Amino acid sequence: MNHDSILLGLIGEDISLSRTPAMHEAEGLAQGAATVYRRIDTLTDRARGRSLQELLDAARSTGFNGLNITHPYKQAVLPLLDEVSEQAAQLGAVNTVVIGEDGRTSGHNTDVTGFARGLEEGLPDATMTTVVQVGAGGVGNAVAYSLVTHGVEQLQVADLDPARAQALADAINSAIGREAVHGIDARGVEEAIAAADGVVNATPMGMLAHPGTAFDTSCLTPHHWVGDVVYMPIETQLLKDARALGCRTLDGTRMAIHQAVDAFRLFTGLEPDVERMRATFLSL
């Protein structure tokens, strides 16, 4: 592709607070490319009422190099693409669409790779025999898939809707060809956490609009590692409690940064500077 200029976008609902545009624009500029990253918010007048297919077609005809896809379109976009990576196809969700010079679209999931890279970076020697993930919705499917394809032997996914947790488990087990994921009821999850090596919060609990924790943190001990996908605030109540109890922790910034790093590489073919993108993210 032509690296003199880069045109990217994010399709989703209520995306005004996303830090992804700033990371891509700053990294592109640092690499010598005039980079524009547009928010395509389907709740705004400009995009409201337009189908996902129409938005993809418009991006192609306008000369976009790529798109990030977020809630609620990560699943809906799959059948609209020319090709999808094996990983994204197995997961059934795409968050990154590369648009070739010929207009062909290819879908990828950098939520999966981003979480894995963040985990390797932040907790490189964490024990992964048994892990509990709290939350089966939203980004939970990508986190669960990432965990069991990057070292976790047995994953228990807990949700207030046990059927949703089991559906996620069944889908991932089918995709990876082994019984590694088990759905459980989030009520009483503390017993499962107490017996596990680590726990990941994949619920909105801990966000500014949802203060608190998704489970009783008194079940944690110093042998646990604790991860959180929430990054606003970076220091969630869960991570505060976990550190006070002697646990090693992984905050949500790592996944957020590395999903953007991996997407930038796919969009441009350029090698991004992780620390530079991290600095941009943390400056916002």
Curated annotation (Swiss-Prot):
It is an enzyme of class 1 (oxidoreductase). GO terms for cellular component: cytosol. GO terms for molecular function: NAD+ binding; NADP binding; quinate 3-dehydrogenase (NAD+) activity; shikimate 3-dehydrogenase (NAD+) activity; shikimate 3-dehydrogenase (NADP+) activity. Shikimate binds at residues 18, 70, 74, 95, 111, 259. Pathway: Metabolic intermediate biosynthesis; chorismate biosynthesis; chorismate from D-erythrose 4-phosphate and phosphoenolpyruvate: step 4/7; Aromatic compound metabolism; 3,4-dihydroxybenzoate biosynthesis; 3-dehydroquinate from D-quinate (NAD(+) route). InterPro entries: Aminoacid_DH-like_N_sf, NAD(P)-bd_dom_sf, Sacchrp_dh_NADP-bd, SDH_C, Shikimate_DH-bd_N, Shikimate_DH_fam. SUPFAM superfamilies: Aminoacid dehydrogenase-like, N-terminal domain (SSF53223), NAD(P)-binding Rossmann-fold domains (SSF51735). The active site is at residue 73. It catalyses: L-quinate + NAD(+) = 3-dehydroquinate + NADH + H(+); shikimate + NAD(+) = 3-dehydroshikimate + NADH + H(+). NAD(+) binds at residues 137-138, 159, 164, 203-206, 214, 229, 252. Keywords: Amino-acid biosynthesis, Aromatic amino acid biosynthesis, NAD, Oxidoreductase. The keyword NAD applies. It holds the Pfam family SDH_C. GO terms for biological process: amino acid biosynthetic process; aromatic amino acid family biosynthetic process; chorismate biosynthetic process; shikimate metabolic process. The keyword Cell wall biogenesis/degradation does not apply. Its EC number is 1.1.1.-, 1.1.1.24. L-quinate binds at residues 18-20, 70, 74, 95, 111, 259. Belongs to the shikimate dehydrogenase family. Homodimer. Involved in the biosynthesis of the chorismate, which leads to the biosynthesis of aromatic amino acids, and plays a key role in the quinate degradation pathway. Catalyzes the NAD(+)-dependent oxidation of both quinate and shikimate to 3-dehydroquinate and 3-dehydroshikimate, respectively. It can only use NAD. This is Quinate/shikimate dehydrogenase (NAD(+)). It comes from Corynebacterium efficiens (strain DSM 44549 / YS-314 / AJ 12310 / JCM 11189 / NBRC 100395).
